[in-house]
Amino acid sequence: MNFNIKSLPERKKKPRDVGLTMVIDKGSSIQQCKDLIESSSQFFDVIKFGWTTSNFMNNLKKKIKLFKDADIDVYFGGTLFEAFAIRNQFEDYISILKDYNLSLAEVSDGSISIPHKKKCEYIEKLSKHVTVFSEIGSKDEKKIIPPYKWIRQMRAELNAGSTKVIGEARESGNVGLFRSSGEVRQGLVEEILTEIPTEKIIWEAPLKAQQVWFVKLIGPNVNLGNISGNEVISLETIRVGLRGDTFNEFI
């Protein structure tokens, strides 16, 4: 920070396991990536190339190297995993991760329907090669998963080898953890937190109101994902009570 402002909440320093900010990239250029790193690299930890966008990006290896050289981890969106898995190309997917020198991968089932046991088998196999994040929740806003099932699946996926479980929201913030209006399913989140350690969860929260809600509930070191690159610094101000929405939380 540029100024000495007293009594701000403590933020974990990078590299960190909690207080993560995960940025979503939907097709930025090399120059845009350089600009993001220059302006904000100290405030985010990992970047996801959303859904299957990595299949269409120019200079993909160069983009990955840019972020890794800035100590920012990179992974492909879970939908890319699903695209390979549903076509019985799981081994091809592993080969791609190796070819692109990725140490992190996401396993999800938001667009495909597979038995949860099979999903956990994928997690177990993949965790032998890379660190695994796994995503819970459907991309279909009409599909409401009850809290007990979220908890059961999160626990099973962590036991299978996931390092973190991700609460689905999409980049729009209106499915999974949230109602179609973007409002948080508060009872769901609170019930999950009675059973699953908060440091094991990344909450997708692309909208400011959602970010504010999670910071107020869990604190400045809540793990948040699907953050737009141009909102990284904005989120950091929310985390430490230097934006109006959380200004009085940490005085």
What are these regions, as identified by a protein language model?
Residues 36-40, 67, 96-97, 125-126, ...:
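Generic structural signal for hydrophobic
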Residues 26-39, 59, 85-97, 146-156:
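Short, acidic/polar
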Residues 104-111, 159-174, 221-245:
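Glycine-rich phosphate-binding active-site loops on the catalytic face of alpha/beta enzymes
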Residues 1-66:
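Conserved N-terminal beta1-alpha1 strand-loop-helix module at the mouth
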